[in-house]
Regions:
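Claisen-condensing/thiolase-fold acyl-transfer catalytic domains that form or cleave C-C bonds
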Residues: 3-96
């Protein structure tokens, strides 16, 4: 079972997604396969737009999300991060 299911998260209800990608087709495929609203995905560009710096992309995308949550009325966001060798992890952020 996916952790989001354990947490009761509905992907359609999440306000923003930052999907890390080394290739543009990855972000497109994830958005398509999960049925995500394109207006909510990588709204300021994903990992490619910042040069996909190894070891830094995840934290850069997380900080982008945190600033966007602070700056707007969005209530939550999800960030995916690569951790090398084809592995991945995601973080869910919410504000009170």
């Amino acid at each position: 079972m996916y952790k989001r299911q354990k947490l009761g998260l509905d992907l359609k209800a999440i306000d923003m997604f930052e999907i890390n990608e080394a290739f543009a087709s990855q972000a497109f495929a994830v958005r398509r396969d999960l049925g995500l609203d394109p207006e909510k995905v990588n709204i300021y560009g994903g990992g490619i737009s910042i040069g996909h710096p190894i070891g830094a992309t995840g934290v850069i995308l997380a900080v982008k999300v945190l600033y966007e949550l602070q700056r707007t009325d969005k209530k939550d966001a999800m960030v995916s991060m690569c951790i090398g060798g084809g592995q991945g992890i995601s973080m869910y952020f919410t504000k009170d």
